[in-house]
C-alpha cells in the first residue's frame, strides 16, 4: 500500500509539472497581430473594416444597416428580422420559428420514485431498507404439482426484500433469517389488506423465493461494504494524505 501511494505521488507530481510548463508558454497570435486589423489598418491585401468602396455602414448601395437595397435590418427585400421576403424570424420563406418546436418529453415521476425507494430506509420498520427489484428465481420443489403452481403464481410473491445493514449481523445466516421474516410479514400484511389470502403452499414457496433473494441481497451488501472499507483504508494511508495535500497546494497556489 505504501509503495502504491509513493508511485501515485510521483505520477501526479510529474503531471502537474507538465501542466505548469504548458501554462507558462506564450500563446501565438494576439490582438492586432497579423490578419485583418481594426479599424482600417489591414495587411497589404487591404481587408479593411469597414470596407472601402461600398458595402460599408450607412452606404447607399452596400449591404449595411438601414439601406434600401441591402440585406439589413428592417428592409423590404433583405433577409432581416420581420420582413415579408427574407429568411428571418417568422417569415413565409424562412425557417420555422421556435414556437413550432416539439416540447421535451416529461420525466416519468413513477420511475424516479421507484429508483429513489430502492436502498432507502423504510419509515416505521425500525431501520430496515428496501432492496432493489429482482427477477424471481427459478426453483424446483420436487414434484410437478408444486412446480406448476409456482410458475402460475410466482407473480404474487415478493420481488424485493427488506433488510438491515450487514454490519449489524455477525454472519450471513442471521442476516438471511431476519430478511426472510420481515419480508414475508410485510408482504403478507400488505396483500391481505387487499383481500387476497395465502395458502400454506403459498407460504412455503414464498419462504424459498425470499430466502434466495435475501442471499443475493447479502452478497451485494457485503461486497459494497468491503469496497467502502477498502476505500477508507486507501485514503487514510500517509502517502495518499501527502499526495492530496500536495494537490490542494497546487490548486490553491
Swiss-Prot record:
Cu(2+) 3 binds at residues 77-79. InterPro entries: Prion (IPR000817), Prion/Doppel_b-ribbon_dom_sf (IPR036924), Prion/Doppel_prot_b-ribbon_dom (IPR022416), Prion_copper_b_octapeptide (IPR020949), Prion_N (IPR025860). GO terms for cellular component: Golgi apparatus; plasma membrane; side of membrane. Residues 231-253 form a propeptide. One of its GO terms (molecular function) is copper ion binding. It holds the Pfam family Prion. This is Major prion protein. Glycans are attached at residues 181, 197. Cu(2+) 1 binds at residues 61-63. It comes from the Eukaryota. A lipid is attached at residue 230 (GPI-anchor amidated serine). Residues 25-108 are annotated as: Disordered. Cu(2+) 2 binds at residues 69-71. It is found in: Cell membrane; Golgi apparatus. Residues 23-38 are annotated as: Interaction with ADGRG6. Belongs to the prion family. Residues 52-95 have a biased composition (Gly residues). Keywords: Amyloid, Cell membrane, Copper, Disulfide bond, Glycoprotein, Golgi apparatus, GPI-anchor, Lipoprotein, Membrane, Metal-binding, Prion, Repeat, Signal, Zinc. Residues 1-22 form the signal peptide. It is a lipid-anchor; GPI-anchor. It comes from Pongo pygmaeus. The lineage of its organism: Eukaryota, Metazoa, Chordata, Craniata, Vertebrata. Coiled coil: none annotated.
Amino acid at each position: 500500500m505504501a509503495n502504491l501511494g509513493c508511485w501515485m505521488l510521483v505520477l501526479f507530481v510529474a503531471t502537474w509539472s507538465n501542466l505548469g510548463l504548458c501554462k507558462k508558454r506564450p500563446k501565438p497570435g494576439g490582438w492586432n497581430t497579423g490578419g485583418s486589423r481594426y479599424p482600417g489598418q489591414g495587411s497589404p491585401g487591404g481587408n479593411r473594416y469597414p470596407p472601402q468602396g461600398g458595402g460599408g455602414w450607412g452606404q447607399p448601395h452596400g449591404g449595411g444597416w438601414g439601406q434600401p437595397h441591402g440585406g439589413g435590418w428592417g428592409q423590404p427585400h433583405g433577409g432581416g428580422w420581420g420582413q415579408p421576403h427574407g429568411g428571418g424570424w417568422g417569415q413565409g420563406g424562412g425557417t420555422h420559428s421556435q414556437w413550432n418546436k416539439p416540447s421535451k418529453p416529461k420525466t416519468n415521476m413513477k420511475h424516479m420514485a421507484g429508483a429513489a425507494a430502492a436502498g432507502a430506509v423504510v419509515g416505521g420498520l425500525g431501520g430496515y431498507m428496501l432492496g432493489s427489484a429482482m427477477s424471481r428465481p427459478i426453483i424446483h420443489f420436487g414434484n410437478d404439482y408444486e412446480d406448476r403452481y409456482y410458475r402460475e403464481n410466482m407473480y404474487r410473491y415478493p420481488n424485493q426484500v427488506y433488510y438491515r445493514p450487514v454490519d449489524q449481523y455477525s454472519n450471513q445466516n442471521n442476516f438471511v433469517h431476519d430478511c426472510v421474516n420481515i419480508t414475508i410479514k410485510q408482504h403478507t400484511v400488505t396483500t391481505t389488506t387487499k383481500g387476497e389470502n395465502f395458502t400454506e403452499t403459498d407460504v412455503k414457496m414464498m419462504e424459498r423465493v425470499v430466502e434466495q433473494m435475501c442471499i443475493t441481497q447479502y452478497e451485494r451488501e457485503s461486497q459494497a461494504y468491503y469496497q467502502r472499507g477498502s476505500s477508507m483504508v486507501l485514503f487514510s494511508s500517509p502517502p495518499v494524505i501527502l499526495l492530496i495535500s500536495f494537490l490542494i497546494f497546487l490548486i490553491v497556489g
